[in-house]
């Protein structure tokens, strides 16, 4: 066996902390390593070409790359292996950046020791790597787009024009999202519906797009290439194929008046109504909660489109890929009770002002004080309502509110030049193209800006709202009465997104929006293969960014499904029939139904296997294994880690690829430090962790073992972490029976976005193990640890 080890400097990202030259020297002494080399940037063209040359010149048959996270560049180096004529799965990546140099910059010596331990573990696994080959399977070219806002519309049209069939599902009765309700859009002040309506109509008329409005996705199963989707179409009580959109005939005779849901509590409509004049589709609907069933609209409809007996409709179809563009919802301003929204009629939200400014809105484009019905002489905007606010659980900036307030203040000044307009802000964030100029223009129009937080809004003696605020530039606390107070409410994830997230096992960020696979390198990829994120589904952003992301998602889908075939990941489960005893344990464990019994032996559908490894951990005889994460490969890593115990307490950690390993990466990207006592072994799912791995680690001398996976109900393999928890809970009892402290085994269920929590857990675990004592101290044994200097020199 001839193994090559490559250690990346990554500029100073690694070499600024770790002694890379020492790593090279130590790696050269390892068994089966015929070449170890340090390189400035391994991912560069020259770095990759160097590896290819070395493989050919030195007849290398295995490669270990010590660099950044495999979640970032594993594919890159697998392509390098292919170019060099080797099987791409004969390469192992070792993470010495995100999980070493970036988190241990305060201890270069132990960071170097840890990096060498990780390289040794990588070499140990590399000895057992096998050649793997991918298989191709047919994929549906149909694309599901969840959400018909501007991001979803852009993605749909891009894909449809490229010949892909698209199914768009929108929960509201019209597509267009929030943009369709706005008056104008910054920084160009274009009429919002004027630029959006043609695209909305194009979606409806495009032969490659199937549109389901007033509908919701109720279930998604399957995987990339063959997602099985179930959609529920809610009854409009109006037949879409018959309705002509002549709303005045039916709505005009309706005796029931209701609040128009599109106007955010301002303005009325009838129980049978058209959401907005430019609705797509141009079909009215009946509000079943308020309709009295008088039958007048049915009598008035010349097309006989009204159908009181209409029932919900279930639709099922397959999709090869999914674009999640679920948008956002506005913060409920009534949660900030000190601002009086819902209590004082003249305190409104920015979106209510948008609807007033819209000529098709409830006031015909006039800004009116709700209590008087007259134009205001004084307007105050209060920024960051529900954003940058720990008291409501939203510490993040909603990114758009500042510019939206600037735009609407301009609109007010243009229509009412004599009206005084004031914006109370913490910081004005105007960082986009033409934004600073827009901010300057707003100032030049006479809008006043007061920096400082608003303490409260209360009703003055004359009934006008009074704003009590701090002015940090004047170092004063002041009060001022206004005719109208506008709250710039922040963005939050939609409630509908919660269900979609559960169906697709999508990770969430601390702000509760969906997390992408990598915030810089893969901003529109979800961690789940075949799923992409567009627009505000992944956080607050401007319209132009949402459009760009919609196009980016479409491009990703075209690349994925362009040939109509998918290359199946070979890292699934496989059965050794000579070992299999036909006990059916794996069949019962596999929640995806990918294992069956044929001729008293387990058989895996390897093309559609999800690759979680739950079955492998459950198999009582080791007959079923996970390719690239086989028992002997992982045990080799465990034994190598514990054979060179360089710290006490010493922790072996098994982290799942999707959440806990990604969380450890994020901890590094955030430069959040934790002790060097941990050695990480990556698995695809926490369910892959065989109790044998834990016992082997403790037997080898590890003082503690951490098994970490996704948060409960958020496992990327649905039930994987539940099974892992059951096994580890049982194993703790076994450890206790052996005579060891069961606290030596710790479990952690964490999202990919909880870096602080991950760091805190490691710190707590180290302290707890220090109190318990070294492994075996329960039997009065001492911990023998060679000096760090002895190991690293």
Swiss-Prot record:
Similarity annotation: Belongs to the HdrA family.
Protein name, entry field: Ferredoxin/F(420)H(2)-dependent CoB-CoM heterodisulfide reductase subunit A
Amino-acid positions noted as binding [4Fe-4S] cluster 2 in the UniProt annotation, renumbered to this chain: 254, 291, 294, 297
InterPro entries, alphabetized: 4Fe4S_Fe-S-bd, 4Fe4S_Fe_S_CS, FAD/NAD-bd_sf, FAD/NAD-binding_dom, HdrA-like, MvhD/FlpD
Species: Methanosarcina acetivorans (strain ATCC 35395 / DSM 2834 / JCM 12185 / C2A)
MF annotations from Gene Ontology: 2 iron, 2 sulfur cluster binding; 4 iron, 4 sulfur cluster binding; metal ion binding; oxidoreductase activity
Superkingdom in the source lineage: Archaea
Residues reported in the UniProt entry to bind FAD: 147-170
């Amino acid at each position: 066996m001839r193994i090559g080890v490559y250690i990346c400097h990554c500029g100073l990202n690694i070499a600024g902390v770790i002694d890379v030259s020492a790593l090279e020297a130590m790696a050269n002494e390892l068994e089966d390593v015929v070449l170890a080399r340090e390189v400035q940037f391994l991912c560069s063209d020259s770095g990759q070409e160097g590896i290819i040359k070395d493989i050919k010149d030195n007849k290398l048959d295995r490669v270990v790359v010590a660099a950044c996270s495999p979640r970032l560049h594993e594919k890159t180096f697998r392509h390098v292996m292919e170019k060099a004529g080797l099987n791409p799965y004969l390469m192992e990546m070792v993470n010495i950046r995100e999980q070493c140099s970036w988190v241990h910059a305060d201890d270069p010596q132990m960071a170097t020791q840890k990096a060498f331990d990780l390289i040794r573990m990588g070499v140990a696994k590399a000895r057992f790597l096998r050649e793997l080959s991918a298989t191709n399977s047919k994929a549906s070219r149909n694309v599901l787009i969840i959400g018909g806002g501007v991001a979803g519309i852009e993605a749909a049209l891009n894909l449809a024009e490229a010949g892909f069939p698209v199914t768009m599902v929108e929960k509201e009765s019209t597509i267009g999202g929030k943009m369709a309700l706005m008056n104008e859009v910054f920084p160009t002040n274009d009429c919002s519906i004027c630029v959006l309506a043609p695209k909305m109509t194009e979606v409806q008329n495009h032969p490659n797009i199937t549109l389901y409005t007033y509908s919701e996705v109720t279930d998604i199963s399957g995987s990339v290439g063959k997602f099985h989707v179930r959609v529920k179409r809610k009854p409009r009580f109006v037949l879409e194929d018959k309705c002509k959109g002549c709303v005045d005939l039916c709505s005009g005779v309706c005796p029931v008046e209701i609040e128009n849901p599109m106007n955010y509590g301002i303005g009325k409509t009838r129980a049978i109504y058209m959401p907005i004049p430019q609705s797509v589709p141009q079909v009215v609907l009946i509000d079943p909660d308020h309709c009295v069933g008088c039958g007048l609209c049915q009598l008035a409809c010349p097309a006989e489109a009204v159908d009181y007996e209409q029932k919900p409709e279930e639709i099922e179809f397959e999709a090869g890929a999914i674009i999640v563009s679920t948008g956002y919802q506005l913060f409920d301003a009534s949660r900030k009770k000190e601002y009086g929204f819902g209590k004082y009629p003249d305190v409104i939200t920015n979106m209510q002002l948008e609807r007033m400014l819209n000529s098709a809105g409830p006031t015909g484009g006039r800004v009116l004080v709700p209590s008087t019905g007259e134009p205001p002489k004084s307007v105050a905007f209060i920024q960051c309502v529900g954003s940058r606010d720990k008291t409501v659980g939203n510490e993040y900036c909603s990114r758009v509110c500042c510019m939206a307030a600037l735009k609407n203040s301009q609109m007010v000044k243009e229509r009412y030049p004599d009206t005084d307009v004031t914006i109370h802000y913490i910081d004005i964030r105007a960082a986009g193209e033409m934004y600073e100029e827009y901010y300057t223009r707003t100032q030049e129009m006479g809008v006043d800006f007061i920096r400082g937080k608003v303490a409260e809004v209360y009703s003055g003696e004359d009934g006008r709202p009074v704003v009590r605020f701090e002015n940090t530039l004047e170092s004063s606390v002041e009060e001022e009465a206004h005719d109208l107070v506008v709250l710039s409410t922040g963005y939050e994830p939609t409630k509908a997104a919660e269900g979609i997230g559960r169906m697709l096992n999508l990770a969430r960020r601390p702000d509760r929006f969906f997390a992408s696979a990598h915030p810089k390198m893969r901003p529109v990829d979800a961690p789940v293969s075949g799923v992409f994120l567009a627009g505000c589904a992944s956080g607050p952003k401007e319209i132009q960014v949402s459009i760009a992301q919609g196009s980016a998602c479409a491009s990703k889908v075209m690349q994925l499904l362009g040939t109509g075939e998918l290359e199946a990941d070979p890292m699934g489960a496989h059965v050794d029939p000579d070992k299999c005893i036909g006990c059916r344990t794996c069949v019962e464990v596999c929640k995806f139904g990918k294992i069956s019994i044929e001729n008293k032996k387990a058989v895996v559908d390897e093309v559609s296997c999800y690759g979680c490894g739950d079955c492998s951990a459950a198999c009582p005889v080791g007959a079923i294994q996970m390719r690239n994460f086989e028992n002997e490969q992982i045990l080799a890593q465990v034994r190598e880690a514990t054979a060179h115990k360089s710290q006490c307490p010493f922790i072996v950690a098994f982290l799942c690829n999707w959440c806990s390993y990604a969380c450890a990466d994020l901890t590094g990207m955030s430069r959040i430090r934790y002790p060097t006592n941990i050695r990480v072994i990556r698995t695809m799912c926490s369910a892959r962790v065989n109790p044998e791995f834990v016992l082997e680690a403790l037997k080898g001398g590890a003082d503690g073992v951490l098994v970490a996976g996704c948060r409960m109900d958020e496992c990327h393999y649905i039930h994987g972490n539940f099974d892992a928890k059951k096994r580890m809970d049982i194993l703790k009892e076994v450890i206790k029976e052996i005579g060891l402290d069961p606290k030596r085994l710790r479990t952690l269920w964490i999202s990919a976005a909880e870096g602080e929590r991950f760091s805190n857990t490691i710190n707590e675990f180290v302290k707890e193990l220090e109190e318990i004592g070294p492994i075996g101290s329960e039997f009065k044994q001492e911990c023998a640890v060679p000096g760090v200097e002895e190991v690293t020199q």
